Amino acid sequence: MFIGRKSSGAAIDPNAQSFITAAGISNAIEIQAINELVLDLKTFSLWSKMLVVYPFVGGTAQSNSKNLKDTSFGTLSYSTGITHGSLGIKGNGSSYANTGLLSTQVGISQNSAASGVYMQSWAVNQTMAYGHFGNLTMYKGLPAIYPLLNSNLAPTYNPATFDGFMQMSRNNATNLIFKHKNNLATTFVSPSLSLNNSLRLYVCFANNYNGVSDWISFNYYSLGLTETDLVNMEIAVQKFQTTLGRQK
């Protein structure tokens, strides 16, 4: 087992090492990517805001199940039909990874929450990539993305492509910020609602709605993030994906 140093000689961050050990990762490039991600999140003062982070690295059910922020919390369990590989996890439209967590258990609040997903592609319309149906998910229609974050009023975002890093954040009762890749963030009116306390959060499938059959390479939940935070999150995650050779 790889302990203490990465291939470049830089010390491994203790939080990164905890994940590496729990995930059973031994590949030097993957270790480097995880270590740099943790260090970048700390440099950008984002680490303390993160609650659940699934980097989907290592290509196994074990490595893909672990939460980078706390490896003992939110460990994913899988239905049949989930594929694991170098690009992350892939469902079949009805399969899913179950966080075991309700929105009320993640650590977000009604007016302080953020979430994001990194997609290699998003091919099928009228599907949801993660979360749960109703008020915490991203929905792909035609030809738009509809982000829902503690609200049942989904704004409409029209991306140039349906791939890469998509993030949404709420810092108040009125507005939602949406950011796609390195494009400028957009603020929408989307009044907040109380957290859902009955549906668990899934990946590859939004609990109670059609799932995706595309590769998912990252998923996170955090406290509310500012526009600057979303920019920095995109920088850190895109660097992580680039190190792994799966950037979009």
Residue ranges and their predicted role:
Residues 1-248:
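Polar, enzyme-active/binding microenvironments
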